[in-house]
């Protein structure tokens, strides 16, 4: 059974200031000889409401650029959407915390994004003395990425990630943090 995740912008169909009914229907239009085709909705359906300038759904990707015992360079890549017709001067910020909730890195950068554009921005952060992730020690960090305008946060996305170094070559095979 395949699970398909998708997003549909219904902005043009919503009547602001009025009650709106949203109906979600799945039609499995392909005939099947099986008594049960498996079609339908098996997970929650969510209504996402966003500002015209926002982080794309599932639009944050956190990547370990480099790592050793003393420092890890982390790239927080954020896909920003500007559905407004005018150019916006906004900021992108990111904060990384350890499992205890202590801030281990944070930063921000100004962004100028044209109207009706989606673009990805990379913010580099550095974590001192990182706790590495592996199968025996699944150390996790939390990220919070936000976009905002002036003093107002417009959108935020959060999640978890592990800091690790992955290597793959024909001689040593797959290594995580230098170990097989």
Regions found by a protein language model. Give the residues of each.
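Short acidic/polar inter-strand loop motif in beta-rich domains
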Residues: 27-34, 132, 148-156
């Amino acid at each position: 059974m395949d699970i398909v995740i998708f997003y549909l912008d219904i902005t043009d169909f919503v009547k602001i200031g009025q009650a709106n009914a949203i109906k979600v229907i799945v039609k499995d239009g392909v005939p099947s000889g099986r008594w049960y085709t498996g079609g339908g909705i098996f997970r929650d359906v969510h209504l996402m409401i966003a500002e015209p300038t926002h982080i794309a759904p599932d639009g944050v990707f956190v990547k370990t650029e480099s790592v050793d015992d003393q420092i890890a360079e982390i790239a927080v890549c954020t896909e920003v959407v500007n559905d407004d017709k005018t150019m916006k001067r906004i900021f992108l910020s990111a904060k990384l915390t350890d499992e205890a909730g202590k801030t281990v890195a944070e930063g921000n950068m100004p962004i100028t994004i044209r109207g009706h554009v989606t673009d990805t921005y990379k913010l580099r952060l550095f974590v001192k003395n990182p706790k590495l992730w592996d199968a025996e020690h699944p150390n996790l960090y939390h990220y919070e990425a936000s976009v905002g305008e002036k003093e107002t946060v417009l959108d935020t996305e959060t999640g978890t990630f592990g800091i690790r170094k992955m290597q793959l070559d024909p001689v040593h095979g797959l290594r995580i943090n230098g170990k097989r």
